């Protein structure tokens, strides 16, 4: 029986991951969070533990010889580095580039295995983009993520959303620092729907580019219903992006008081363009709750790593352990009773 430590184990994604593990008795699961809060589950071999991972020495309080799933970006890179120095494996779901970069630096020179982008986005979105980037004609990729507001998301996800609206990023074309929302794009998230506005944001892109490739990758964020995206676009034009980022916690608390509306779904579109700016192809994904999809992607990655050949030391990405078809097959298996999913590949328009 192997040890599996879930940092953030009682949160929105963590609680779903614990439930998915109910059919995997080969794991001794340690659900760790700042507040000890039991999650309803039939799994017998789960231990709930309260631990502030930000305090010094927290790494020594975790079980040894474990695979660690890192869900909160509050986890210090130093803790991750300490676990990797013990030749352990850490799976990370983070969507903030600066944090992911810090984890990659922490993995340097260790015998452990850090896998970034283990989730829905980044994760499945990474695999979709990497599949398109394998075409040598591809010069630019634009990846749009749309989150439905059919329910209130967990605190960590909501805080990330508001932070992302004010976190500058380096433009792939010019290299200069750009404020989110400065270069929006419109995406067809499904074939029979008008293009929807999406706002440019900072996002991790590890694993997308083929070895030696120089594909430019742009990331965008949208909300369903679309008028919410337009409201955020107005706020950004008024220069409120940085303010929203700095007050992400306060805005998250406020958002939890708002009514739930829109679709309870997650949609991703990855579009490939050649050097003339002509669309080559695109991939469209539609699924259910983002937290369900992220938990299932973690499960699929765990299964792939257990059944795979050699474990890769240092920092690598989900692309090093899964391909797109494996991920989709695993999602359908784990989420068979939750809701429909669809993936379409659209060739270059005539």
Language model segments and positions:
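Beta-loop-alpha module in the N-terminal Rossmann-like domain of NAD(P)-dependent dehydrogenases
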Residues: 70-83, 98
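N-terminal Rossmann-like NAD(P) cofactor-binding module of classical short-chain dehydrogenase/reductase
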Residues: 66-72, 90-92
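C-terminal active-site/capping subdomain that shapes the small-molecule cofactor and substrate pocket
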Residues: 236-350
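Conserved Rossmann-fold cofactor-binding substructure of NAD(P)-dependent oxidoreductases
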Residues: 50-65
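N-terminal Rossmann NAD(P)H-binding glycine-rich loop of SDR-like oxidoreductase domains
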Residues: 4-21
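N-terminal Rossmann-fold cofactor-binding loop
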Residues: 31-36
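Rossmann-fold NAD(P)-binding glycine/threonine-rich loop
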Residues: 94-113
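Active-site-lining helix/loop region of Rossmann-like oxidoreductase modules
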Residues: 7, 135-271, 278-279, 292
């Amino acid at each position: 029986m192997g040890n599996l430590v879930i940092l953030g184990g009682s949160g929105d994604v963590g609680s779903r991951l614990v439930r998915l593990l109910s059919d995997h008795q080969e794991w001794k699961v340690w659900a760790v969070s700042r507040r000890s809060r039991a999650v309803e589950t039939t799994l017998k071999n789960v231990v709930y533990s309260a631990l502030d991972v930000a305090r010094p020495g927290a790494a020594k309080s975790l079980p040894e010889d474990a695979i660690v799933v890192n869900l909160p970006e509050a986890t210090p890179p130093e803790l991750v580095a300490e676990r990797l120095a013990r030749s352990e494996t850490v799976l990370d779901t983070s969507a903030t580039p600066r944090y992911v970069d810090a984890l990659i630096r922490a993995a340097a020179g260790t015998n452990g295995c850090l896998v970034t982008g283990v989730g829905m986005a980044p994760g499945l979105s990474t695999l979709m983009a990497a599949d398109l980037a394998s075409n040598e004609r591809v010069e630019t990729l634009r990846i749009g993520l749309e989150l439905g507001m059919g329910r209130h998301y967990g605190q960590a996800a909501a805080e990330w959303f508001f932070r992302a609206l004010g976190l500058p990023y380096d433009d792939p074309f010019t290299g200069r620092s750009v404020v989110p929302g400065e270069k929006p794009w419109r995406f067809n998230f499904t074939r029979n729907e008008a293009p929807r506005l999406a706002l440019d944001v900072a996002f991790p892109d590890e694993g997308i580019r083929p070895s030696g490739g120089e594909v430019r990758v742009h990331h965008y964020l949208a909300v369903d219903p679309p008028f919410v995206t337009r409201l955020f676009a107005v706020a950004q034009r008024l220069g409120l992006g940085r303010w929203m980022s700095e007050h992400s916690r306060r805005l998250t608390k406020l958002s939890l008081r708002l009514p739930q509306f829109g679709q309870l779904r997650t949609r991703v579109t990855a579009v490939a363009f050649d050097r003339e700016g002509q669309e080559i192809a695109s991939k469209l994904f539609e699924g259910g709750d983002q937290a369900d999809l992220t938990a299932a992607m973690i499960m699929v990655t765990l299964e792939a790593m257990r059944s795979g050949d050699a474990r890769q030391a240092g920092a690598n990405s989900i692309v090093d352990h899964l391909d797109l078809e494996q991920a989709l097959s695993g999602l359908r298996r784990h989420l068979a009773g939750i809701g429909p999913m669809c993936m379409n590949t659209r060739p270059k328009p005539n």
